[in-house]
Amino acid sequence: MQIILLEKVANLGNLGDIVKVKDGYARNFLIPNRKARRATKEAIAEFEVRRAELEKIAAEKLAASQAVGEKLNGQSFEITQKSGVDGRLFGSVTNGDVAELLKKAGFEVEKLQVRMPEGPLKMIGEHSVQVALHTDVVVDITINVIGDHA
């Protein structure tokens, strides 16, 4: 299916690009999330009229993400979990836990934006975690998992 992108999509293209994707990806993800429209002649003409407005909105989102990224980059956060004497956690620290911790600290972050390269954290200690605030803004933070031997 030919679609026109209404915003930058990772591994696909930038605002205004006309790309061919599988029908299911377009119908089930891109179009419902308002990231793309079918590339009909009418849609392309309408997009060209709204192009400046959409580019302005995209630039504002990027600027806001960069501002938050500057505050967040390199920061360290602590989370306490129950653990055994050998340093292994009972359970794990997931991206949802990290997103909740960041929200309490005043940062608006969804759990899908938190990337944990090694998967959920299962040991006490310091761990590096990435937060993707925008497709172009990815910052590194440190999560210090403290064990509660109670």
UniProtKB/Swiss-Prot annotation:
InterPro entries: Ribosomal_bL9 (IPR000244), Ribosomal_bL9/RNase_H1_N (IPR009027), Ribosomal_bL9_bac/chp (IPR020594), Ribosomal_bL9_C (IPR020069), Ribosomal_bL9_C_sf (IPR036791), Ribosomal_bL9_N (IPR020070), Ribosomal_bL9_N_sf (IPR036935). Disulfide bonds: none annotated. Keywords: Ribonucleoprotein, Ribosomal protein, RNA-binding, rRNA-binding. The keyword tRNA-binding does not apply. Binds to the 23S rRNA. Belongs to the bacterial ribosomal protein bL9 family. This is Large ribosomal subunit protein bL9. The gene is rplI.
